[in-house]
Curated annotation (Swiss-Prot):
Classification of source organism: Eukaryota, Viridiplantae, Streptophyta, Embryophyta, Tracheophyta
Reported tissue expression: Expressed in flowers.
Organism: Arabidopsis thaliana (Mouse-ear cress)
Protein name according to UniProt: Protein NRT1/ PTR FAMILY 4.7
Membership in a protein family: Belongs to the major facilitator superfamily. Proton-dependent oligopeptide transporter (POT/PTR) (TC 2.A.17) family.
Record's subcellular location: Membrane
Keywords attached to this entry: Membrane, Transmembrane, Transmembrane helix, Transport
Cellular compartments per GO CC: membrane
Main localization (coarse): membrane
Length: 589
């Protein structure tokens, strides 16, 4: 302040009144410009591409619009996905296996396309624009499905219409899944402790919002489809995604948008290509260079090769790009920051691979568990619960657990560990993986109990397979495994999203966050492969395959669940190997 006062006095003393006025105004404008620069978010703009300002853009208010939109978006998606097998088999003339394969392909494609949405948001557009375009595409697909369902035709043209609608929806869902979570997460200031805490809260409540949409989808919308007609169900989904757009736009004035920074895939391939080229060139050169004369010389060369610290082979391999930068062709020259970013991406990939088995468990329980419940007593008092409504149990449990975790468990963890996060992202993911092991063990025990009831009923009725009426065992036994799996999903999905977003370079955060959905897609695909492989192996030498028979009572489902439990345990050991060696790039302590 004293400096500015001295400058103004100097102007008044040595210049004319008119020139004094102009120079003082110029000085004031320079000060205003400096203030604006200091208050602007670096690398962020508002929806009109103007600099985003602190105190005006971002924060929990901006993220709250995203949470409401997620309720509507997931309602629109799951309302169809949860009951689509029944629609294809009863209305469109698909065989049970054909319907299941069609739904698996649709779900897997939708989740995989999240990678495309994340890539476009990082490279060329903002998450704001990707959401709006994706919502329009999903709305168009749902309109096609609504018209197709109203026609009730099984002609080939109707099936073409059906699949056009489904995959338009898949494309739209992929774009939304790839842009909406990072759009909400980027509203928080990661430079402050309060901003990081709010971002953690956001990811937990994102799962809560996702569960709210799922609850409405598997209850209200499924009831409409079963009792009023499928066009009503598709119509509700269409209305939900349409309403989500003005809700999303309502937050435009307070959003801050990350400026796209070019293709992260290009950077990834450029660095890897440069590393391979540098390694090849070094090997060619080493054939000419005289070898070390003494052991000390050799030790010195090894030290130079491992100058990247604790990264071992990865650090040595990618470090060549920096060390040999001047000798590389100009198109392959990379900055140290680019090499560092690629190193981070490679290090998070094993964590991503370790989560696929959990999602495979989710896929199995969403199919076989419903069939288990359909053979059991599904009455609660005078009310009969449809087996397709079983997903209500994990959804409701996740809705209860998410705020409990935020407001009770997390503060206790912070107090006991004296750290900002309380429980690290990798610990959250690991907790989810452990719960998935418990869920599969519980599923195996429940199926064993159910089979004992089947045997008892068969002996009492002198029949070989008791399946004509509900078994005298309540379906609530199956709900136990759903509770464990719902808990696993909450810990792992929220942990994955926050881990990938926080640890990924700022230039590829949307793409990295989309790995959470890609893991889900690979879990669905792997589940189909696993069932086929189990049936093939167990059916050798004229044995009965574990998962084939006239009905579920002839399956060896409990053996399959135990196999899943063992595989999940092995996968957890694989996860521990990588997680224990991972060094966070961000503040986790």
């Amino acid at each position: 302040m004293s400096t500015n006062y001295t400058a103004i006095n100097h102007i008044l003393h040595f210049h004319s009144p008119n020139s004094c006025f102009l120079m003082i105004m110029s000085l004031e404008f320079e000060q205003m410009d400096e203030a604006n620069r200091l208050s602007a978010w670096n690398g962020y703009v508002d929806w009109r591409s103007r600099p985003a300002l602190r105190g005006r853009h971002g924060g929990m208010l901006a993220a709250s619009f995203v949470l409401v939109v997620e309720v509507l978006e997931n309602l629109a998606f799951l309302a169809n996905a949860s009951n689509l097998v029944l629609y294809l088999s009863t209305k469109m003339g698909f065989s049970p296996s054909g319907a299941a394969n069609a739904v698996t392909a649709f779900m897997g494609t939708a989740f995989f396309l999240a990678l495309l949405g994340g890539f476009l948001a990082d490279a060329f557009f903002t998450t704001f624009h990707i959401y709006l375009v994706s919502a329009a595409i999903e709305f168009l697909g749902l309109m096609v499905l609504t018209v197709q369902a109203h026609e009730h035709s099984t002609e080939p043209w109707s099936r073409v219409f059906l699949f056009v609608g489904l995959y338009l929806v898949a494309l739209g869902v992929g774009g939304i899944k790839g842009s909406l979570p990072p759009h909400g997460a980027e509203q928080f200031d990661e430079e402050t402790s309060s901003g990081r805490r709010q971002r953690s809260f956001f990811f937990n409540y994102f799962i809560f919002s996702l569960s709210c949409g799922a609850l409405i989808a598997v209850t209200v919308v499924v009831w409409l489809e079963d009792n009023k007609g499928w066009s009503y169900g598709f119509g509700v989904s269409t209305a939900a995604i349409l309403i989500s757009v003005p809700v999303f736009l309502a937050g435009s004035r307070v959003y801050r948008l990350k400026v796209p920074s070019g293709s992260p895939i290009t950077t990834l391939f450029k660095v890897l290509t440069a590393a391979l080229y540098a390694k090849y060139k070094k090997r060619r050169t080493s054939r000419i260079v005289v070898t070390c004369h003494t052991r000390n010389d050799c030790d010195d060369s090894v030290t130079k090769q491992n100058c990247d610290g604790d990264d071992g082979f990865l650090g040595s391999f990618l470090g060549e790009v920096v060390r040999e930068r001047e000798s590389l062709p100009r198109p392959l020259r990379c900055t140290e920051e680019q090499v560092k970013d690629v190193k981070i991406v490679i290090k998070i990939l094993p964590i991503f691979m370790s989560t696929i088995m959990l999602n495979c468990c989710l896929a199995q329980l969403s199919t076989f568990s419903v069939q288990q419940a359909s053979t059991m007593n599904t009455k609660l008092g005078s009310f009969t619960v449809p087996p397709a409504a079983l997903p209500v149990f994990p959804v409701v449990f996740m809705m209860i657990l998410a705020p409990t975790y935020n407001h009770l468990l997390l503060p206790l963890a912070r107090k006991s560990t004296k750290t900002e996060t309380g429980i690290t992202h990798l610990q959250r993911i690991g907790t989810g993986l452990v719960l998935s092991i418990v869920a599969m063990a519980v599923a195996a025990l429940v199926e064993t109990k159910r089979k004992h009831v089947v045997v008892s009923c068969c002996s009492n009725n002198n029949s070989s397979s008791y399946s004509s009426s509900p078994l005298p065992i309540t379906f609530l036994w199956v709900a136990i495994q759903y509770v464990f799996l719902g808990s696993a999903d909450l810990f792992t999905l929220a942990g994955m999203m926050e881990f990938f977003f926080t640890e990924a370079p700022s230039t590829m955060r949307s793409l990295a966050t989309s790995l959470s959905w890609a893991s889900l897609a690979m879990g669905y695909y792997f589940s189909s492969v696993l069932v086929s492989a189990v049936n093939f192996v167990t059916g050798l030498n004229h044995h009965n395959p574990w998962l084939l028979g006239e009905n579920l009572n002839q399956y060896h489902l409990e053996r399959f669940y135990w196999l899943m439990c063992v595989l999940s345990g092995i996968n957890f050991l694989h996860y521990l190997f990588w997680a224990s060696r991972y060094v966070y790039r961000s503040n986790q302590g």
